[in-house]
Amino acid sequence: MFCYQCEQTAKGEGCTKIGVCGKQPEVADLQDLLLYALKGLALHAVEGAKVGVNDHETNVFTCEALFSTLTNVNFDPARFQVLIPRVVEYREKLKAKVKAAGGKVDFADPAATFTPAKTLEGLVAQGANVGLKSEPELPPDIVSLKHTLLFGLKGISAYADHANILGQHDDAVYAFIYEALAATLRKDIELGDWLKLVLKCGEMNLRTMELLDAANTGVYGHPVPTSVPLGPKQGKAILVSGHDLKDLEELLKQTEGKGINIYTHGEMLPTHGYPGLKKYAHFYGHYGTAWQNQQKEFSKFPGAILMTTNCIQKPQQAYTGNIFTTGLVGWPDVPHVTNRDFSPVIERALALPGFPETVNGKSVMVGFGRNTILGVADKVIEAVKNKNIRHFFLVAGCDGAKPGRNYYTEFVEKVPKDCVVLTLACGKFRFFDKDLGTIGGLPRLMDVGQCNDAYSAIQVAVALAKAFNCGVNDLPLSLVLSWYEQKAVAILLTLLYLGIRNIRLGPSLPAFVSGNVLDVLVKNFDIKPITTPDEDLKAILG
């Protein structure tokens, strides 16, 4: 195996024996083989588009399959053993349609005619030959951009999958995914053209996040400021982790009147702000912090646990009988719920003791999406003009286990009192429960939402720039970002596509970005690694 798609990759270079995430070598090889098969399918899809062939079922499946290879989603080799032959089935159906329409179906690349082995061992062996290091003859900078594109596609596919579940999709997004996957098979693309493809990936991710925003707000309403208790309520309990709003809604419906309280974990926290979800009286509070603390936190949770998307870690013995997966999530021997029938989860929750008493602890505020912030835009603009607000910081992104991530806690603690902190994604758990007070009736710490709500933050920035008659880069706004997995890669590419400059990125830079590619990013976008909170605040504020 060789994998370096996440921030915690071994030694900052790559995982070769086992993934730091817990991914076994055979799963890494199976994921590489799945990607290879998808590239062969993409060749046919690109040609199909030229003759009017477009199959929605294939499009949706492609995103699901790509999403399955994202960090901390699916660790179950048996699931990949099913997925890989399905790619070939979809490819052959598509091939027949393209041929019937007069399109090209003969390709020189062997990915187009790939035949999967009949056994799991055979598939693993095939995967070992088509991984990220299978093209040693290519220049390192080409490989760097090619892999950046591939990881960005994984991020897009995750958001496209969530949007499609709620009825929003755009064929242009699927067309780009195929175009980019097919491009990764080529060896004749120049460096400049790879860079264009990478930035186009950012453009298409912006469109995909727009679709997901429309899906979430269209179905559940715009988030509103909501206080979420961090202490438990006496009674039976189910904990929901991940990102999928539809899964959460179905669980809320199925548990209504059963005496079970529903708690969020990780990136599910912002869902408390959606009117269509918060209307359920038993949708109670939030438990725990970010994904990397789940083994400790889940061990103490006295109810059932449902993982809806990434991020799952190896379940500990203390809760192996209590945890369930659904959707694209998989872990060997963990019960998997299909078709959103959460009966097994509910039965387990009823059998477990639940919380013995109500604890009136802290609470946190969520629901500061674009609709909420732009609803008080006049207050914000006035506060800036009156110099009550000096600067805005978007301190956002993924959390992780590295000690260096304490930077983000310290940074927020040291932000001057005349500055506002916007946050989103699970990086917020480094400081989400801190009371930073208010400025002119506005909270100094505002939770914009999940990682995909970067779209919301972008819309706020664009609206403020318009109000001040300047560019986004001219606003008193600084982006201090943390990254971990491939959705963060896609979001970073979106920011670069938009021409956002002076982004501070940490806790370490991606292993897949070569020195020369980094130089290009620094030269064109002034992207820089984080240093210390004091140094960075001084550089930003003077």
Swiss-Prot record:
GO molecular function term, any single one: peroxidase activity
Family named by the database record: Belongs to the HCP family.
Any single GO CC term annotated in Swiss-Prot or TrEMBL for this entry: cytoplasm
PANTHER family assigned: HYDROXYLAMINE REDUCTASE
Coiled-coil ranges per UniProt: none
Main location: cytoplasm
SUPFAM superfamilies: Prismane protein-like
UniProt-annotated binding residues for [4Fe-4S] cluster: 3, 6, 15, 21
Essential cofactor(s): [4Fe-4S] cluster; hybrid [4Fe-2O-2S] cluster
Residues noted as binding hybrid [4Fe-2O-2S] cluster in the record, renumbered to the chain: 243, 267, 311, 398, 426, 451, 485, 487
Its EC number(s): 1.7.99.1
Catalytic reactions on record: A + NH4(+) + H2O = hydroxylamine + AH2 + H(+)
Pfam families associated with the record: Prismane (PF03063)
Keyword Cytoplasm: yes
Gene it is expressed from: hcp
Key words, A-Z: 4Fe-4S, Cytoplasm, Iron, Iron-sulfur, Metal-binding, Oxidoreductase
The protein's name: Hydroxylamine reductase
Enzyme kind, highest EC tier: oxidoreductase
Job description of the protein: Catalyzes the reduction of hydroxylamine to form NH(3) and H(2)O.
GO biological process, one term: response to hydrogen peroxide
